[in-house]
C-alpha cells in the first residue's frame, strides 16, 4: 500500500463530467493542490450511498474553509455510473468523481480488494487519503465492513 511521503502514482483513469467523462491522471490533477480523496468499493452500494458520499457533499464547504482545494471520490466503476451517482447526490461539479473502471489506480495505490466472493470483482478499499502537491500526507483505510476512519467527520477532525 502507498505510504505517507510517497507520490501519487501516474495512471490514466476517467473523471465523471457533466458530458460523461474525460481522461485524467490523478498525479497531474493533484499537483499543486491540497486534496482529500476518499475511496470506496462502489457507487450505489449502501454505506457509500447513505453515508460516505453524502457526508463529503455536506462537509465540502467546511473542508474548503480548512484549506482543502479539492475533494475527490475514487471508486472502481465506469464514468457513466459515477456520473449518475454524483447527480443523484448533488455532487457532480463539486466532488471530483474518479472512475477507476479497471482498478488501475486502486492497484497502483495498493488499496485494491478482491471481492469476487461477493460477486463484485476487484474494488477499492474504503478509506481516505490526504494529499498535498501530489504527496500522501496521511492515509486511513477501513477494516473490512467498517465505516469509522474515512467519514467526512473523521476527516474534519484529522484536519484540525
For each predicted feature, which ranges?
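Chalcogenol-based redox active-site neighborhoods
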Residues: 1-160
Amino acid at each position: 500500500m502507498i505510504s505517507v511521503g510517497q507520490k501519487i502514482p501516474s495512471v490514466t483513469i476517467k473523471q465523471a463530467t457533466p458530458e460523461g467523462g474525460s481522461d485524467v491522471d490523478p498525479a497531474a490533477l493533484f499537483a499543486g493542490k491540497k486534496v482529500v480523496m476518499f475511496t470506496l468499493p462502489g457507487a450505489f452500494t449502501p454505506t457509500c450511498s447513505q453515508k460516505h458520499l453524502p457526508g463529503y457533499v455536506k462537509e465540502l464547504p467546511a473542508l474548503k474553509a480548512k484549506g482543502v482545494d479539492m475533494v475527490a471520490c475514487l471508486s472502481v466503476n465506469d464514468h457513466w455510473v459515477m456520473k449518475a451517482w454524483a447527480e443523484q447526490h448533488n455532487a457532480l461539479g463539486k466532488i471530483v468523481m474518479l472512475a477507476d473502471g479497471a482498478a488501475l489506480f486502486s492497484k497502483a495505490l495498493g488499496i485494491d480488494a478482491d471481492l469476487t466472493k461477493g460477486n463484485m470483482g476487484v474494488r477499492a478499499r474504503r478509506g481516505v487519503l490526504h494529499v498535498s502537491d501530489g504527496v500522501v500526507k496521511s492515509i486511513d483505510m477501513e477494516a473490512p465492513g467498517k465505516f469509522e476512519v474515512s467519514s467526512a467527520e473523521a476527516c474534519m477532525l484529522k484536519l484540525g
